Structures are given as structure tokens and as C-alpha cells.
């Protein structure tokens, strides 16, 4: 089907009021404690003291976290990287906004850890080697209500964001979405969650069955977390499973 253009976009922070209502607590709460099983969690706090922020450490966090200070990307950590202290910034100021987006990347379905898995942050956050006791706001983001998105809410470059792509089909047929140039996230096709993509590979293209398409206008909804995107998505006729 060739190239399909991005026709609208909005970043996660502008979209939040349409997707989730915050739940507050003194310390961050795991995804499961918020009644959620999959997707993402966003943790937000205002650092009221005037300080120079130069390190972050998350306790009992899973699986992948991106931290922002006043919407500036400060840290990205995955799996065992979450267990260590990370130098950031430094960031200076008072009333700085700390936002941590945590992705649930899957669950173990066997063995001794079956009943002990917690996603999101189930411990605390350490700032400058001190435990941060703040009024945390937690936003549960299972991404099941994307029809509520308002693409006119606003957009800032470099932030996690939603992208709307449209293309026309005469006769539905199998195709492959080439996600080269996009960072990490997932794709929804005509309200069906097609799957995840990641520039780390090895797979470069997502298989899109023709059964998910319809004659006329079709829609892709892409959520991307790394601030990496293109103006188009290419729909190809061959797969790309990466380097052999």
C-alpha cells in the first residue's frame, strides 16, 4: 500500500486528562495495586524543595522506566538497570516536575515467581541518595480507551506521543508495517492492538493481516515512547525479520 502519512499527533502529557484520572499516595504504588494488569503506569510528583537533582534510583521497579524532569528526558532504564543508581542532569530549580513512565513488558507464567510479580514501581524513588516522600500521582494506562484521545490537545517534540496514520485500501490484503525510524511502542489497527515494535530489533516490520483491514479508509494509531518518529509509515509486501 506504500506510504501512509501521519495526519495527527498529541503527546502523552497533553493526552493524560482524556486517558486516566490520578490516584494519590505518599509512595509509588505497583500497577496491580491500582487495579491494572498490563500496559503502562505514569508516576508524577512535584519536588517542592529547591535543589540540584543529580541522581535517581528506583526500588522494586519493572520492567522499563523513562524519567523526565520538567519534560526533559533524564533517564531510561530496563530490567537489571533499574536496580542501580543513575546519575542524571544535573537539574536545578524549585517545584520541578518528576514524571516516570514505566512499561510492563510481560509476565513470567511459570515457576516460583508466578505469584510475586509486580509491575510499575512497588517500592520507592530515591533522589540524590535520599528517599523521596512526596504526594505521588499515579496514572493507570492500560491503553484500552484510545478512542478518547483528543489530537488537538497539544504536542511537544521528544516526548512519548500518539500518532494517527490514515491510508486507503481498495481490496484488503496482508501487508507489513515498516517501523524503521520509530523508537519503541505499539501499533493499533482499526481499534485492534496489532503488537509492539522496538528499534533494538531484530524484527523491523510488523505483520498486518488483511482481515484487520477494510475497503476504504483505515487507521493506524501508534504510541511511541522514545521521541523517535517519522512523518509516514510504509506498508510493504515483504517481511523483515532483521539480520541473519
What is each of the regions a protein language model found here?
Residues 1-132, 143-153, 221, 225-228, ...:
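Carbohydrate-binding surfaces of carbohydrate-active enzymes
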Residues 37-48, 158-170, 204-206:
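Short beta-strands within extracellular/lumenal beta-sheet-rich domains
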Residues 53-68, 98, 167-190, 197-198, ...:
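Aromatic-lined ligand-binding clefts that engage carbohydrates, nucleic acids, or primary amines
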Residues 69-72, 79-80, 112-114, 180, ...:
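Composition- and surface-driven signal marking solvent-exposed, interaction-prone regions
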Residues 74-83, 195-206:
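Aromatic-rich membrane-interfacial microdomains
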Residues 85-97, 162-170, 205-217:
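Short, surface-exposed tryptophan/glycine-enriched loops
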Residues 156, 160, 183-184, 193:
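C-terminal effector modules of nucleic-acid-centric enzymes and ribosome-associated factors
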Residues 176, 206-244:
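Terminal leader/tail segments of proteins
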Amino acid at each position: 500500500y506504500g506510504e501512509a502519512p501521519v495526519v495527527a499527533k498529541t503527546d502523552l502529557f497533553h493526552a493524560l486528562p482524556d486517558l486516566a484520572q490520578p490516584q494519590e499516595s505518599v509512595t509509588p504504588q505497583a500497577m496491580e495495586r491500582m487495579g491494572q494488569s498490563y500496559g503502562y503506569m505514569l508516576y508524577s510528583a512535584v519536588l517542592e524543595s529547591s535543589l540540584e537533582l543529580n541522581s535517581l534510583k528506583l526500588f522494586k521497579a519493572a520492567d522499563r522506566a523513562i524519567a523526565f524532569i520538567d519534560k526533559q528526558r533524564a533517564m531510561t532504564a530496563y530490567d537489571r538497570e533499574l536496580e542501580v543508581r543513575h546519575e542524571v542532569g544535573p537539574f536545578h530549580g524549585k517545584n520541578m516536575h518528576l514524571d516516570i513512565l514505566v512499561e510492563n513488558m510481560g509476565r513470567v507464567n511459570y515457576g516460583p515467581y508466578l505469584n510475586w510479580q509486580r509491575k510499575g514501581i512497588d517500592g520507592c524513588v530515591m533522589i540524590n541518595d535520599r528517599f523521596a516522600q512526596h504526594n505521588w500521582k499515579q496514572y493507570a494506562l492500560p491503553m484500552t480507551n484510545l478512542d478518547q484521545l483528543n489530537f488537538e490537545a497539544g504536542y511537544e517534540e521528544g516526548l512519548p506521543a500518539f500518532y494517527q496514520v490514515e491510508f486507503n485500501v481498495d481490496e484488503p490484503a496482508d501487508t507489513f508495517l515498516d517501523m524503521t525510524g520509530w523508537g519503541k511502542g505499539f501499533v493499533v489497527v482499526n481499534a485492534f492492538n496489532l503488537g509492539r515494535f522496538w528499534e533494538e530489533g531484530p524484527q523491523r516490520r510488523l505483520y498486518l493481516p488483511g482481515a484487520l483491514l477494510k475497503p476504504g479508509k483505515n487507521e493506524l494509531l501508534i504510541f511511541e515512547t522514545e521521541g523517535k518518529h517519522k512523518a509516514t509509515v510504509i506498508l510493504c509486501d515483504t517481511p523483515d525479520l532483521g539480520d541473519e
